[in-house]
Amino acid sequence: MKFIKKLISIFVNNQTLFRNLFAIFLYKLNLIPDEYKGRVNSIYKKQQYEKKFLKFNLKYNDLGFYYLDPIPTKVFLNKYYEEIYWQSRGDKNYPIRLRDIEHYKLLKKIYPDFDKDSKKVLNFGAGHGGLSILLYVANHKIYNFDFGQTNNLFSERWNQVNDLCKIDSKFDLIYGSHSLEHVQNIKEIMKKFDEISHENTIYFFEVPNCINSKKIVPPHTYYFTRKFFYNYFEKYDYCETLDNSGIKKNDEGVVIRFLSKSRVKKNLLK
């Protein structure tokens, strides 16, 4: 009986993995229904890409992060995100998640006056666009950056950005939820953030906490600790690691949440 319970537990905890393996098996035998072929093809290609990720090495930088070595090229990553990442997932059309609500509540708690007037917001790696929608409803101007493009939900104050180099204005909030770990060059990204920020810009990031991680998790290219945020910003207003229930865990939480109304340290941008 214990063996049966263990098998059931393994299956329940890995439902997505087993479902994808079965779908790929049917796909290879040309038995998958036509309406699912595109999705399963993307899942299959994603697995092939992930094998390539696992061939890289993981190195540590004293500024507080691990990174893939050699870092994948921009062409490699762009193709992956444009053609495979979102196509292999089914959650982009579920725009509001508990995490988005938690982020909005924390933003309002740390900066109570944030909604008093309309702000210009960059959602970096916007994906499903959860916080973008909440801030849009609060009358802010939204700019969504994502290789896979966020759903075009509104006709005003809702903008799609596909190239950071084309941005030349300043933002009041630069936000990224589980996106910094996907970039190709963190120094270039932080330099660009500094260029499009002003002295009162709020930075809000959430990333996986990798202080004890020595394992590559495709398609992540960077693996952060809180030390990264302490090193890169002049000060911070909130920097905690949290478990899956949102409870603070010193350095042992599964994610890092960081908020700061300060500048990126100039000496790190040279």
Model regions and ranges:
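Conserved N-terminal segment of class I S-adenosyl-L-methionine
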Residues: 3-169, 173-177, 186-190, 226, ...
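Helix-to-beta-strand junctions that scaffold the AdoMet/dcAdoMet cofactor pocket
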Residues: 183-184, 197-199
